[in-house]
Amino acid sequence: GWESLDEATLTIRLKWLGIFFRPVTPGRFMVRLRLPNGVISAEQLAVLAEVVDRCGEHGSADITTRQNLQLRGLLLEDMAPLMAQLERVGLTSRQSGHDNPRNITGNPLAGIDPEEIIDTRPLVDAIQAALLGPAGPRNLPRKFNVAVGGAPDSFLLHNDLAFLPAHHNGELGFTVMVGGFFSAQRNELAIPLGLWLPADQLSGFTLAVLRHFERAGNRQQRNKSRLMYLIDQLGLEGYRQAVLDSWTELVAELAAQQESHHAGDPATAAPHDGSHLVSRAPRDGLGVQPQKQAGLHWVGLHVPMGRLDAAAMAELARLVRTHGSGELRLTEAQNALIVNVPAARIQALQAEPLLQRFRPDPSPLQAEAVSCTGNAYCSFALIPTKGTAQMVLEELEQRVELPHAVRMHWTGCPNACGQPYMGQIGLMGAKARKDGQMVEAAKIFLGGAMDAGPKLAELHDKGVPLSDLADVLEQLLVERFGARRRDPAAGPSPSVAVS
């Protein structure tokens, strides 16, 4: 049983396989997948629904802020058959946790977006193949986030390495951004590296960046081991040259091993001023939207707080097969998109019972709400984020009307997995004193922007008791976001429970 495992295996080694021990639920493990670009097939989703269903009341899944899925409630003895099951349907959980490159994100509308600049799917797939291949990193100093932008609303500056579409001498490629991250100690948006790359060079360059980080990153101070600290140490010009040197070494090494298909060509990199084609905040992607393919639509569904149960996963798989092309897309806002829906199928899809729970037309408060898992599963979290967020949002819906969506990010602790600094309103689990007692509370951050003038949210209130949070947020929504207080005689708004 799991009790026989030594501490290092239980809390570190298993994470290389994507298996996570959760002290809050001893004996029940979490498995994090890798879903490059957030793409999952109906067949894969149906298999995952069966896995979660076998966990009974302990089973659930979460859509993450990296367009990924986490499965909860598994037993250790489930793991070997699960890994075989994942492999059979083309999925993996390898290197999805601890000091490894995490799921690679891209445009969730890749290939179907009327506003698409470039299809990110093959680029993201190539990067994942390189990172998980024989030349990929195995022991980074710290976790590492990579993302590829493909549309005018691809906000990616919270990643360690981000590729934003850009032109150079009339050719479409990518400008390189580096160093973005959130943590308990420091929060930074990525900065221009001063390089432009052709689209077919991203995987080789990413390998070179990670090879250098693996060799040169800080291993003595874990709280100063993210990429931006290395950039600070070397200076931007010094870091850029070190990465180019690493790339040249990688090309020679892989050529000797006859693995050069992942290496790329450093000579293709060009100096660049960091300008790019991303110009506005991300769309929510919800509702019925026309694809660039005539006669086809995607239907964006709001999944409250990204929480799924086995029945919902199985039903989603059925809807994707019945009404779409058998493919689902996951978004960083923890929502789901059914793609390639013919116009003739839209009415039937809209009539499906699941769409009363996962609505294509959520309220402006629900549409862009994001939450980490909270203390139901995470021992770092100070509050139950998902349940609290849903309860507070439903209360606010009864009190105010909003003219537009307000992006609200909830996180349980300063590690900031819920990305509170990206929210127009960010909330972070805390403690506060009320009536002489220490109680669960939330810090409030305001002002996060993900448009052409990106900005991290700043601290507004260092601790509001959860019991007072709806009152405080109501006032903020009225004063700063144009909300109008509802007539108390108005009927209730629809609500969805989140466990």
Question: Language-model features: where?
Answer:
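Gly/Thr-rich phosphate-binding loop signature of adenosyl cofactor/nucleotide-binding cores
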Residues: 1-49, 242-251, 255-322, 337, ...
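Small-residue-enriched alpha-helical segments and adjacent helix-cap loops
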Residues: 2-8, 28-175, 204, 302-437
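Short, flexible, solvent-exposed loop/turn segments with mixed acidic/basic and small polar residues
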Residues: 19-25, 57-63, 215-220, 288-293, ...
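Short acidic (Asp/Glu) and glycine-rich catalytic loops that position anionic groups and cofactors
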Residues: 26-28, 106, 183-190, 218-225, ...
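Terminal amphipathic helices with adjacent charged low-complexity linkers/tails
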Residues: 77-78, 86-90, 214-288, 333, ...
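Flexible helix-coil linker/hinge segments at domain or subdomain boundaries
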Residues: 93-98, 212-221, 249-266, 358-366, ...
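Mobile "lid/hinge" segments at catalytic clefts and subdomain interfaces of large enzymes
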Residues: 138-241, 421-486
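Long hydrophobic segments that form regular secondary structure
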Residues: 282-283, 288-299, 303-330, 465-499
